[in-house]
């Protein structure tokens, strides 16, 4: 869609004012911002922007200028229901119904386009040095292998899912917490359930 430089300036000014203040500028303020002394000239540009579907005006209200694209930006993002796992049943797929505690509506973009993902709610402070806090939910891509140093969700001998940094060493596996006060978990065998690819934190 082609608009003039002046119309672009007016459009961007209205958009910035709405974002910053929560309401649109007056015609006088628009004129001052873009160097137009005549209010009728400003009205003319607004009419052209409205005709091109970029704004909507209410003639009964002086400041009722609506930026239509802001409605699009403010739309609720698509969500996907991601399973949250708890105690893991040995020999069962990680997302088997026996392992799922509940489903969490995650904004689709946070799943990074992955389809085989699950979430694990962090209990405790074993990963605080990695910025993963008690109560956070990690987003995990299902996979059964990992590279040394990657943060994974693995299954312990007690069939509990745990989030740790993974290391394969000479004759054992080390699941390393990111907390200087805690000792690593040393295992002869380890079952990797997935790699951590993201984090969800509720700050309310």
UniProtKB/Swiss-Prot annotation:
NCBIfam families: lexA (TIGR00498). This is LexA repressor. Homodimer. It comes from Listeria welshimeri serovar 6b (strain ATCC 35897 / DSM 20650 / CCUG 15529 / CIP 8149 / NCTC 11857 / SLCC 5334 / V8). Transmembrane segments: none annotated. Its EC number is 3.4.21.88. Belongs to the peptidase S24 family. The active site is at 126 (for autocatalytic cleavage activity), 164 (for autocatalytic cleavage activity).
């Amino acid at each position: 869609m082609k608009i003039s430089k002046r119309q672009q300036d007016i459009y961007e000014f209205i958009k910035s004012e709405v974002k910053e203040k929560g309401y649109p500028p007056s015609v006088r303020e628009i004129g001052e911002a873009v160097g137009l002394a005549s209010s009728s000239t400003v009205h003319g540009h607004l009419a052209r922007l409205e005709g091109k579907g970029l704004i909507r005006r209410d003639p009964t209200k002086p400041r009722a200028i609506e930026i239509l694209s802001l409605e699009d930006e403010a739309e609720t993002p698509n969500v996907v229901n991601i399973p949250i796992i708890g105690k893991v049943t040995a020999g069962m797929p990680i997302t088997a119904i026996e392992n799922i505690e509940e489903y969490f509506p995650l904004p689709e973009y946070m799943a990074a386009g992955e389809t085989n993902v699950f979430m694990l709610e962090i209990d405790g402070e074993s990963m605080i040095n990695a910025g993963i806090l008690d109560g956070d939910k990690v987003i995990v891509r299902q996979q059964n292998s990992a590279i040394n140093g990657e943060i994974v969700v693995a299954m312990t001998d007690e069939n509990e899912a745990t989030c740790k940094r993974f290391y394969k060493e000479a004759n054992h596996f080390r699941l390393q917490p990111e907390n200087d006060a805690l000792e690593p978990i040393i295992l002869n065998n380890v079952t990797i359930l997935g790699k951590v690819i993201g984090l969800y934190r509720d700050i309310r």
